[in-house]
């Protein structure tokens, strides 16, 4: 029995290796995957109103917002912009902000975001991971639901040189989880769906969108909160190389 199990395991490894050898490109979400919310900045903003919220509490509460997006979209909601609005409400309430103050804070953060994105923290290991992937010969691309600023943000943060293609939903006119936004990226890269992998942090938007486009994906789950998701999860893009 042990020999049979070992043989089966070896066969699985070999099949995975052959599959990995086909991969020519890697696609990434932007916010929550390459750049993260500036929780320290947000905590300082709250302190101006006399509210003591530490950055770590805000970071952990954010999962509630992502879960709200998943609940809405997986229940059939089609309006992604509406879902993102519920994200902020659920997140801030989970962080301890009274419901009647959420709109006010949301407007303030929206103004900050429009001036200089709130997703502005590039975490340790990101540049090194992208350099390894680029040096290994992979084409790299970003596929992001955004407001037209992603290319400028990648330049500001020093990420732009790594990417061959940047797809911003505001510019191309279609947003995840619609598979068409992935098809645009594939066409510009000159690759097929089975030659690509994608990494993103919101299951209903990133993972289900990639699946609909025929692309295998990895869910970014830094704090192991997506326990209900039966899907390949990683904590950081560093885990993408070697491919798993």
Describe the role of every protein-language-model region.
Residues 2-30, 100-103, 127, 131-134, ...:
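Asp-based, Mg2+/Mn2+-dependent phosphohydrolase catalytic module
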Residues 19-128, 136:
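N-terminal helical cap/lid subdomain that shapes the substrate entry/recognition surface
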């Amino acid at each position: 029995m042990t020999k049979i199990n070992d043989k089966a395991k070896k066969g699985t490894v070999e099949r995975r290796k052959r599959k990995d050898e086909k991969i020519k490109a890697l696609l990434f979400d932007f916010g929550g995957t390459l750049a993260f919310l500036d929780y320290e900045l947000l905590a300082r903003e709250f302190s101006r109103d006399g509210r003591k919220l530490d950055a770590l509490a805000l970071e952990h509460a954010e999962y509630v917002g992502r879960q709200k997006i998943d609940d809405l979209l997986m229940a059939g909601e089609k309006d992604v912009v509406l879902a993102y609005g519920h994200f902020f409400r659920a997140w801030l309430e989970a962080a301890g902000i009274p419901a009647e103050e959420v709109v006010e804070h949301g407007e303030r953060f929206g103004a900050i975001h429009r001036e200089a994105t709130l997703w502005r923290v590039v975490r340790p290991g990101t540049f090194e991971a992208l350099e390894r992937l680029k040096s290994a010969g992979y084409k790299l691309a970003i596929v992001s639901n955004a407001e037209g600023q992603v290319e400028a943000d990648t330049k500001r943060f020093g990420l732009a040189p790594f990417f061959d293609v940047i797809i911003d939903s505001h510019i191309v006119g279609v947003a995840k989880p619609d598979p068409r936004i992935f098809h645009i990226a594939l066409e510009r890269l000159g690759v097929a769906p089975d030659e690509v992998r994608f990494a993103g942090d919101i299951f209903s938007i990133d993972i289900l969108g990639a699946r609909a486009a025929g692309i295998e994906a990895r869910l970014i789950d830094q704090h192991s909160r997506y326990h209900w998701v039966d899907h390949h999860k990683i904590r950081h893009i560093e885990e993408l190389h070697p491919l798993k």
